Amino acid sequence: MGQTVTTPLSLTLGHWKDVERIAHNQSVDVKKRRWVTFCSAEWPTFNVGWPRDGTFNRDLITQVKIKVFSPGPHGHPDQVPYIVTWEALAFDPPPWVKPFVHPKPPPPLPPSAPSLPLEPPRSTPPRSSLYPALTPSLGAKPKPQVLSDSGGPLIDLLTEDPPPYRDPRPPPSDRDGNGGEATPAGEAPDPSPMASRLRGRREPPVADSTTSQAFPLRAGGNGQLQYWPFSSSDLYNWKNNNPSFSEDPGKLTALIESVLITHQPTWDDCQQLLGTLLTGEEKQRVLLEARKAVRGDDGRPTQLPNEVDAAFPLERPDWDYTTQAGRNHLVHYRQLLLAGLQNAGRSPTNLAKVKGITQGPNESPSAFLERLKEAYRRYTPYDPEDPGQETNVSMSFIWQSAPDIGRKLERLEDLKNKTLGDLVREAEKIFNKRETPEEREERIRRETEEKEERRRTEDEQKEKERDRRRHREMSKLLATVVSGQKQDRQGGERRRSQLDRDQCAYCKEKGHWAKDCPKKPRGPRGPRPQTSLLTLDDQGGQGQEPPPEPRITLKVGGQPVTFLVDTGAQHSVLTQNPGPLSDKSAWVQGATGGKRYRWTTDRKVHLATGKVTHSFLHVPDCPYPLLGRDLLTKLKAQIHFEGSGAQVMGPMGQPLQVLTLNIEDEHRLHETSKEPDVSLGSTWLSDFPQAWAETGGMGLAVRQAPLIIPLKATSTPVSIKQYPMSQEARLGIKPHIQRLLDQGILVPCQSPWNTPLLPVKKPGTNDYRPVQDLREVNKRVEDIHPTVPNPYNLLSGLPPSHQWYTVLDLKDAFFCLRLHPTSQPLFAFEWRDPEMGISGQLTWTRLPQGFKNSPTLFDEALHRDLADFRIQHPDLILLQYVDDLLLAATSELDCQQGTRALLQTLGNLGYRASAKKAQICQKQVKYLGYLLKEGQRWLTEARKETVMGQPTPKTPRQLREFLGTAGFCRLWIPGFAEMAAPLYPLTKTGTLFNWGPDQQKAYQEIKQALLTAPALGLPDLTKPFELFVDEKQGYAKGVLTQKLGPWRRPVAYLSKKLDPVAAGWPPCLRMVAAIAVLTKDAGKLTMGQPLVILAPHAVEALVKQPPDRWLSNARMTHYQALLLDTDRVQFGPVVALNPATLLPLPEEGLQHNCLDILAEAHGTRPDLTDQPLPDADHTWYTDGSSLLQEGQRKAGAAVTTETEVIWAKALPAGTSAQRAELIALTQALKMAEGKKLNVYTDSRYAFATAHIHGEIYRRRGLLTSEGKEIKNKDEILALLKALFLPKRLSIIHCPGHQKGHSAEARGNRMADQAARKAAITETPDTSTLLIENSSPYTSEHFHYTVTDIKDLTKLGAIYDKTKKYWVYQGKPVMPDQFTFELLDFLHQLTHLSFSKMKALLERSHSPYYMLNRDRTLKNITETCKACAQVNASKSAVKQGTRVRGHRPGTHWEIDFTEIKPGLYGYKYLLVFIDTFSGWIEAFPTKKETAKVVTKKLLEEIFPRFGMPQVLGTDNGPAFVSKVSQTVADLLGIDWKLHCAYRPQSSGQVERMNRTIKETLTKLTLATGSRDWVLLLPLALYRARNTPGPHGLTPYEILYGAPPPLVNFPDPDMTRVTNSPSLQAHLQALYLVQHEVWRPLAAAYQEQLDRPVVPHPYRVGDTVWVRRHQTKNLEPRWKGPYTVLLTTPTALKVDGIAAWIHAAHVKAADPGGGPSSRLTWRVQRSQNPLKIRLTREAP
């Protein structure tokens, strides 16, 4: 046991290469998939005994070959290569087939004493067993053999005998040499090793050598067959050691298959086996599938009961197993049983289950692969071991592996050629190299510390810089103040008037001095005030006073801070360092100037009204902390000025107290005061604490079981990463997450599902609420039918008699329903909170918001829970819309009692209502956006303000929002559909949004209608309804009313647009359609109550007897079923309606008969008839023909008499027969202009169009019922026009293809033959089409201007007075304006260039001469904006000159270039090139960053060549980085950035990049090495020693001599160190460098002095700028932009920060270039402050 079973099919698949080789020798090709299909599925149906696993039985192969080669329809030519190859394997077997192909046995010897009747010898069995079998050969009884360990199959599948098998080999010769003596017939061979193992305790049978045995029937010692049933231990072991059939059908099927092969059970044994291993239901399913597999004589499954019962009986059959027929029946039965097991065990395909298998965190790839394969076997019909399925299994293995493993597997090179084993090995490597959790935590900790350290260092540097800048500014400020004070003092001394000798210096009076002045105050001298810091040591200045009162002390961040109350300050200010500062800043303007200061992060502030978070301005220069208007507003402070000073009081006039408040309740501090709520007193809260969310906590529906969310069959888990979230938003939703975690609504989890969390800011506050994006989950969840009530008709169940209302809004309603644990992982999301130790996923244990089925599930649950309340209170009306409840009663007492009962019920059920939103026992409430009062409903003011506050729409989306909002109020707006008609076309996709006067008028009318919206009565279902209907221009309008005393009270205003078909009917029929449409809409409000229809037309007669020419049968039936329901719909008298109110007028309207009007409007021509005219001038026959000939549809039309052809013409290819009929009929009418004509046609289409449908099409605008344009529109219009040409006309329909000899038959045949002949023989002439398209460009529409006449006179054109147009070159001349319109339209269609359109027009042979065609065409093509944005443009900008250094090492160009493959991580090469000498330095790098650039500049270039003066680079990220630019500023380097996408600007280094790459490529090919880093020095050597433009190499320019190649220096350098030759060489080098450098510098300077032709663009020009990276269908040019600045080679335009090379722009002015510009002249005006600008042509 445990070894594999080898079958012929598996054997050939294992040696498939040999099979293909044998097939090629047979000159055929075979495919593996078709080989398996034919062997296992096709050939077993031939009814020749072919087993599903193949056989090498030559007789069976021959029989299958006969079936395949059968002539006629029963043959199978596609199977010929495969059966021929199989035959070659059996008749000429390769070595691996020979052991399975048995030679034919010799004829058997007659037995000496047979104990059983003998059967005639035969070479092969008539029927096959479960596996292919060969006839065993006869032989002597061999010695018992020991089971070898050869690894071969344990069961000989190529023999028919049951265990023990007979030896298939020929009998061995006798030991004594009696070779001719055979073994006695009575001896039987030993059992096979397998049989010995299974049945070792039983005696081996002694059977006749000529009798086939079927176990458990075995021949005993006396020659009688014995029966050996299954043992109980076998059945017990099989049942307990194998999974059930439902759990793993494949494994149990394999077990039963092996039992059927090895044990050869009888019918009873099979039943016992099935009854033991299968359940009753499984057994019935297997038997049913087995009976379905029974095939009839034709090889197809049969359903004949007798054949099915004979092959697979359900009752014990009377088969005799001692006969060959009985054994054949048993073999066939086992085959069918096995087929039934296989079919019954085939589970439905569920790929979602397979995709749900993912690799665990610590699961090895091998274990995961086994689970994946097991899922394929269990949930799909595919075998994962099949080579054809290896690709699918490999892709599943990659996609469903752990994320880190999957990502690395996806990046493997040559992935498509990797086998599954290769992927597993790679995954094992990745799995074994994973970092441990400890290592990961250590890495994260280390990265966090490094990040914090960097941030701390940056903050310290910023703080130091800020302090340094602040000290510098303070120093400047102090110096300014001190100098100013000194100047003031000195200036004051100079300005003081001189005192007289007896004048007092204090009071300026004469007669005494200052010391004796009586006015001078006396007393002890007070302490001298301290000198202010601003005055330093100035003795003459007055010091700064301490800050005056009022002051107030508040706690900020837990620390007390004393603030100066400053009502003039907009924001509150802190002076001390408050900790971390935010990135936001503000500009502060003070008396000494303006400066930018930063904001603090949010700080907790304790106010009198609570604790709030607030952000302060950090102004260190401010002398005192300020309490500004922002905090004073939150404080609600009151400042009183009294004699003792200012006092700061609270909002109630009391001293400020400190109150601590949760941050999540901060928004309540900003809420405006509301009117006192008299309806909800404390008694309601105290009497029902469990019913309110404020007192009862979170609700839980106790009667509802946890909900299970079913997924779609093909759904797979979706995982979307969390979107980036700002710190403010995260802190805002953090309290909500914490609250939900504390309540158990959120719990941590690990789930393959993940959707992002979106923080949404509440309007008017700084609070956030978490909203989960569940759109992807909603797509994968099964849809359920929504049962939420429609708010449109919900209030129809509220009678006007119930005028006391209670409205309750359930709080957190969805959270009242629990989720089943199996469905909770669907709604997982990411959340990290280091303070709480949460870093992972959270999910909901309650029904979440945002889930598409949440409203329906909650609505149904609440309906079930409130069913008892409705039964117990039948007098109350309870309406429910999801979580909004409305309770209505007839009196206040009933309303109070009902409300108490409802609150008690809600509390007991576990639901919680919001006390803040409750409206209890009131006569006026707001519900679902309506205002309910006294049995009427009004639009709320908030709803009106929402519509009125919307600005004029600018986009289709804004318009859709407006129409959606206004459409909610359409019941209050009479004729809303007609009013909004101009707006709806602009909402369609692909329509140009053109807001015109009509749209603005409709927009204003809708807003005005909302302001005057009336009150609508609530529908009273106990009274009948009246519907007043009117129709105007395809719009149905109506008002639904009910009588209130003698008046009619409106219930709803209805309006709707009719469909295109009904809109084309006569007015009377349009009224029928309008009534039907509005009756259907009114039914939503009337709930099937009686309805009386009043209209200005007597439509009841029309509905009962509708005209047959306008309405289809389906529409007629629909109208009659809807409007002739007398129990529900009745028609009132005809009334005239007021257009404003849609109510009847007091006077009667004009009466008319609708049937008479319809009879008059049935056709286009009143005298058109279908009866022949007796006095007709002509009687013609028309016909059109359309046929296929040689794959092409040809068409023709003809007009004939009975004997001759009047007109016949071939029509363009592809013309339909209907169109040809219309053309023929139209041609006949044209030729009979002014005459009397009888015309016959056999086309029902043409006849009906002329008599009936033409007028209908014309009225509805030639549109179909779907609103699309009808077919053959032009032909129908031409026919309708031609109907009026004959004087009198009769169009008669005649049957087609008549065979009689009447005049109609002969004429019809003549027309048919002529049309067919014209279609086949003639060439269609497209230039002479019958239908003349109406064109606006006709001579009668031409209007020539004065300029046109002047141009025509110069051309020499002639004016035709009769035809009233000019003629030139024999053609009518088209005016200039017409030419422009035509050419502009053609260009908009084609967007061709000037030359292409000119050539196209010249070849078109236009019947008109287009005036000024070329000039107009050129103007159109040059001013086309679309062409300017897309078409390429040739650059006319000449090359500029390149600036070079004046000596080596002063001017470098730098660039990064990428070199692949990047060995050892080196992917980039940083190249430096000296622009003076051309010397190159290149460094391999692993990254392309600014850090690498600065490192190489400071460590390599500076120590060797000195500090550069100029660096030139492109605009790469490494060069424009702040790091690079800062280093350049500190070192005094002029860093020049070249134009973007202009490699010529960095031409020297770009060319050197190419040289290096080419050299490295050659070196790698020559050396065979792939390490380009190793070969780089050789490439640099070549570049440094290549002569430049002046014949010198960079090495010679730098060192003054060629490089040494073969001269090696003496190892002892001490002898030459101070030798005269070395000194002379150095002196010569100095002289040579000067002789070389000076001419080079002069040559470079000469290039710079050479004048450069600048580009033609100037400041103020308008240009298009090339878009270098265009996306799909994006224009090539963007703009236009205005030029602001220019250089000889570049431009600076408005709107783009970078400079743009002149080659990347093109002119956007109409002239096509900068040369063609307008001239502006400046003139003075009478007003000195105004000038006049006039534009002149160049």
Swiss-Prot record:
Changing Y165A: Drastic reduction in the number of virus-like particles produced. Keywords: Aspartyl protease, Capsid protein, Coiled coil, DNA integration, DNA recombination, DNA-binding, DNA-directed DNA polymerase, Endonuclease, Eukaryotic host gene expression shutoff by virus, Eukaryotic host translation shutoff by virus, Host cell membrane, Host cytoplasm, Host endosome, Host gene expression shutoff by virus, Host membrane, Host-virus interaction, Hydrolase, Lipoprotein, Magnesium, Manganese, Membrane, Metal-binding, Multifunctional enzyme, Myristate, Nuclease, Nucleotidyltransferase, Phosphoprotein, Protease, RNA suppression of termination, RNA-binding, RNA-directed DNA polymerase, Transferase, Ubl conjugation, Viral genome integration, Viral matrix protein, Viral nucleoprotein, Virion, Virus entry into host cell, Zinc, Zinc-finger. A motif (PPXY motif) lies at residues 162-165. GO terms for molecular function: aspartic-type endopeptidase activity; DNA binding; DNA-directed DNA polymerase activity; retroviral 3' processing activity; RNA binding; RNA-directed DNA polymerase activity; RNA-DNA hybrid ribonuclease activity; structural constituent of virion. Residues 345-393 are annotated as: Interaction with host PIAS4. The record marks Y131, P132, F215, P216, L478, A479, L534, T535, L659, T660, L1330, I1331 as: Cleavage. One of its GO terms (cellular component) is viral nucleocapsid. Residues 163-178, 434-466, 486-500 have a biased composition (Basic and acidic residues). Changing S192A: Complete loss of stable anchoring of viral PIC to mitotic chromosomes. Residues 741-932 form the Reverse transcriptase domain. Mg(2+) 3 binds at D1183, E1221, D1242. It comes from the Viruses. A motif (LYPX(n)L motif) lies at residues 130-134. The modification Phosphoserine is found at S192. InterPro entries: Aspartic_peptidase_AS, DNA/RNA_pol_sf, G_retro_matrix, G_retro_matrix_sf, Gag-pol_Znf-H3C2, Gag_p12, Gag_P30, Integrase_cat-core. Residues 430-435 are annotated as: Interaction with host UBE2I. Mg(2+) 1 binds at D809, D883, D884. Residues 108-124 have a biased composition (Pro residues). PANTHER family: GAG_P30 DOMAIN-CONTAINING PROTEIN. This is Gag-Pol polyprotein. It comes from Moloney murine leukemia virus (isolate Shinnick). The gene is gag-pol.
